[in-house]
Amino acid sequence: PDRRWLHEVRDRASVGDLVRAPWPHLLIRRLDPPRPSLRVGWTGTPASTPQLVAGVRARARGGADDAAYSAFLRDSESCLDALVRALEEDDPRQVRQQIGRSRHLLTRLGATSGIAIETPRLRRLVEVAQEHGAAAKGSGAGGGDCGIALCLPGTDVPGMCSAWEAAGIRPLDLSVYSRPEDAP
C-alpha cells in the first residue's frame, strides 16, 4: 500500500471508512487455496520487512538505483499477475516459473541495493525445497526469517522437511485457511 497516502488520510477518516475506501496501489482479492500444499520453513533468524523495505527505498532514491527499483516494482507486479493466473488455472509449470522469477527479482534487487535479501540459510531452504520438487522462495522482504515452498505434485514433502531440519531450518505447522463451505 501507499504508506504516504495512508498517513495523510488516517486522521480524516474513520477506521470503517478507511477499510471500505479504495487504496492506491493495493488490491486485495480472495484466491482459492492452491492445489499444491504450502509449507513454510523458519531459518531461525528474525527479519523486519519494514526495515528491509525502508533500506532498499533509501538506497534507491534519486540515484541510478531508483530506475532499478522502479523496474523491480514493475516486474514484480507482472510476476504476481502471472502467478495469480497460474494458481487460478492450476498450472504447476507456470507456478514454478513465477515463484522462481520472483526469487530472481528479489535477488537482483538485493544485489543492486547492497542489502542481503537472501541469506545463506534462506538460500539453502530454497535449494532443499527445489531438490525435493517444490517451488520455493523467501517470504516477505527476505533478510533471513522464513521461506515458502509450494509443494507441487511429486514433491517429497517428508524428505524436504527432514532435510530442512538437518540444515537447521524449522518446518512450521501452518496451512492456508479454507472456508468450511469450500471444503470438498
Predicted features along the sequence, with ranges:
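Short Gly/Ser/Thr- and Asp/Glu-enriched loop/turn motifs at secondary-structure junctions
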Residues: G140-D145
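C-terminal nucleotide
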Residues: P1-K137, I148-P184
